[in-house]
C-alpha cells in the first residue's frame, strides 16, 4: 500500500489512467465489431462508413500506445481485405 503522499497520488493517477485506457481499448474493439457486422449483413455502404470510422479510432489508440502500431496495421489490413472481397 502507498504510504507517502506522492505514492498515494501516483496510485490515484494510475487507476484513473487504467480505467481510461481500458475504455479506449474497448471502444476500439466495438468499432471493429461494427465493421465486421456490417460486412456480415452485406451492406457495402454501411461497411465502408464503419471502416472509415474504425480506422480513425484504431489509429488514435495506436498513437497513444494502447495497442501496438503493427497490431493496428494488421486490423486495418484485414478489415480492408474483407471489404474488397465483399465488393468483388
UniProtKB/Swiss-Prot annotation:
One annotated GO biological process: translation
Keyword tRNA processing (UniProt): no
Keyword tRNA-binding on entry: no
UniProt KW keywords: Ribonucleoprotein, Ribosomal protein, RNA-binding, rRNA-binding
Gene designation: rpsT
Family: Belongs to the bacterial ribosomal protein bS20 family.
Name listed for the protein in its UniProt record: Small ribosomal subunit protein bS20
Region of interest (Disordered), residue spans: 1-27
Function: Binds directly to 16S ribosomal RNA.
Record-linked NCBIfam families: S20
Biased composition (Basic residues): 7-22
Gene Ontology terms: cellular component: cytosol; small ribosomal subunit
Native species: Cellvibrio japonicus (strain Ueda107)
Any one GO MF annotation of this record: small ribosomal subunit rRNA binding
InterPro entries per record: Ribosomal_bS20 (IPR002583), Ribosomal_bS20_sf (IPR036510)
SUPFAM superfamilies found in the cross-reference section: Ribosomal protein S20
A family per Pfam: Ribosomal_S20p
